[in-house]
Amino acid sequence: MKQQPPLTIPTTIDVPQAKIHTAPNGTKIYAINCPEYEVVRLSFIFHAGSITQRHPFTASATANMLAEGSERMTSQQIAEQLDYYGSYFDINIDRDYSYITFCSLSKFFEPTAEVIEQVILHPTFSENEVAIYADKRRQQLAIERRKVETIAREQFAQAIFGKEHPYGICYTENAYESLCSENIAEHYKRRYTAENCIVVCSGSITDKVLERIISITAQLPHTAISETLELPPYHTQHDIRIQHDGALQSSIRMGRLLFTRTHEDFVPMQVLSMVLGGYFGSRLMQNLREQNGFTYGIFSAMVNFQNSGYLAIATQVGTEVTEAALEQIALEIDTLRNELVSEQELLLVKNMMAGEMMRILDGPFGIADVTTENILCGFDNSHIADNLDRIRRTTAEEIRSLAQKYLDPKDMVTVVAGDFS
């Protein structure tokens, strides 16, 4: 009978460092040259997330409307030129940052760069396009707000940070009625500037490609007035139930306010979260799905922002088993606080985390994503090896100690949206 080979965690990981260039306006450009890939991916990361907006929805509207017409190109022309050359662009926005990413074949980078220049530097935000966008998003949000999952997610953010905190605030769909071109243009002018931007490029970054990227980046204007974002204190609530008549399922969010990625306990807490609910065979999945059949899926994860972070557990269960599901989640947390994780389980989790790191870093795009995350946290790519080493050194005793320290029931926030009648 063949034996399974022993599980081993890599002792180190070699990730290329990004080469740093500085545009004439001071914006940093981080280049990861992988000439064997005949593609170029270019990301502009602006400190222009929702915490920086002065009016509801202007941060997301600004990012999403960059390609809806420029000084020289209509939205249709932008889309057609990208499509013709097999290029694409993607928009992502979170509480802190907006990420504008373009990807093209190396041989078609120049015509793609023409579009990039228009989208990043010369958007027009026409009133007509804004009205169409606002109406569509208002309807989408109204539909989303009927779902218990959306209700629980938004209420959980408010419970963790406070209803008026930029990380917790949620606007009603009616706020889209006040969205206007003037406010979007104002947000763009304040936040899409040289001081608020970093650029990360990966793939076949030849001298010619780099020169073109620098020429575009150099045109970003300087910030007219320096801004310091001052975040208010957190106001945490611990137990919230939201009645949603007719709901067949309850959406559960549980967790607590913690810390950013730079905290010394962040990586071992990632290991703890993985054990608890971070993969298909995790404790919460085994209990609530496999043993009790309460849900199709449940997960836990460490969520991080620039200035804060939290642990989140999320699932949806039938309304009739809501209380039983909450009891089982509490039971698994209590077990982590009182019993040691077996060496076999801990080794499995460590290997899965190491394997996921290897998978993400297999190619220039994944390396670019990790590089971006490291830059925003103040690290370079040597931090990846440090994280892997920290995962390897995490012990069962440390997991139990962290659970006792951070998963005290009195500190946990629980939000449930469903029909309790």
Predicted regions and their residues:
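Charge-rich, well-structured scaffold segments of protease-associated domains
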Residues: 1-3, 22, 77-225, 231, ...
